[in-house]
């Protein structure tokens, strides 16, 4: 939508290291081609400098675009350009700056998860032209694409003929409104994703022990420390501490137990040849149901 509105038949500068592919084989180059924008790759896979943007700007440049690497990371001899510098360069050259944030968040996340995930509020301090991010993921609301930015640019997007087909319905908007109100009230327990992220290890251990006590007579259960991947196209390769319960039963192989659990809507994983229930995603009111 953004690219089609502002960059049709014009160049958009993107770092080679940010030409991402997300789930379902959706790729930045293909999305750009569909919009009518002309992709101009700059820098290299592992290193892109501000000078790469500055040297590539010409009379047909419409936009400087940054894409957050939300589902992979490049380590070692690598660097990219801070969005703050991209904003300044875009303004100096009278072009649009745009940040596809992927999974932006609104508050400081636990376990230093905010370190490599862009903060919506922090990025807004740079007074960018346009930002986009997901309504679900770390924001913790409905699945939707959210665009914020300068009023005159948003007004132009609203006039794009594609908007009629892509706009969300009133139910989606009402759920999103309720979610954002929870942020304003600082009531994180109303946002399941954040509630799970912020649950203390002590609480998780207590829940795990509670389940173990309920099922000890019918199977072999053990409480242990484990690590949780956030997943969902966010915080690549980052794990946070958690507690889990491993379960074994008679001569049942782990794969069979896992299959039986999934048939009853209980998602688990196999770790060290044992079925593991991760209590980072299990609530207090679900323990009795799992035991049964």
Segments from the language model and where they lie:
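Short, low-order "capping/linker" segments at domain edges
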Residues: 280-292
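Conserved PLP-enzyme active-site core in the AAT-like
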Residues: 1-181, 216
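Conserved PLP-dependent catalytic core of the aminotransferase class-I/II
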Residues: 14, 172-173, 177-231
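Flexible, glycine/charged-enriched surface loops at secondary-structure junctions
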Residues: 94-98, 135, 166-171, 186-192, ...
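Extended hydrophobic-aromatic, low-complexity segments
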Residues: 156-157, 189, 254-258
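Composition- and surface-driven signal marking solvent-exposed, interaction-prone regions
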Residues: 160-161, 272, 290-292
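Conserved C-terminal alpha-helix-loop-beta "cap" of PLP-dependent enzymes
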Residues: 205-283
